[in-house]
Amino acid sequence: FFSSLKTINPTISRYAKVADIISYQVRIIKLARQTLQSFREANQFSVEEIEYCKKVLDALLDDCIQSVTELLEIITPDKLQMTDDERLVRIDKLYGDMQDKFTFCNVMSEDIGLLALQRLSEQIEINRSKLINGIK
């Protein structure tokens, strides 16, 4: 009986959420890179703000790696003693976690873009005001 708990049912490996979790990880990596690059190129943020953003995104990527590592343990034969139902429950939980991580990354990216635009707009207004008032 216990040896059967180490065997992986092929339907578990082909469970759609397994591929979706991997897909989320790829999307998060791409979005995190784009976000950090945009953050740096915006020229609206201090070195400290950029470092903070990098730390947050690095922590997010580390969490993603942990989730995918756990997924691989769940779907690799002889790694864990679990029933099929237990494996599906764990996969569903990992899927929800990856959805949350992607949503967080997406919202962070949008918020950073909005903040950069707000700061740029503010700088334009300051420059316009200086020009109108003859201030250098």
What are these regions (language model features)?
Residues 72-136:
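Long amphipathic all-alpha helical oligomerization modules
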Residues 9, 33-36, 61-68, 98, ...:
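A structural signal for well-ordered alpha-helices, especially hydrophobic packing surfaces
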Residues 3-4, 13, 23, 38, ...:
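Generic serine detector
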Residues 1-35:
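Early exported N-terminus immediately downstream of N-terminal targeting peptides
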Residues 21-92:
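Extended amphipathic alpha-helical interaction segments
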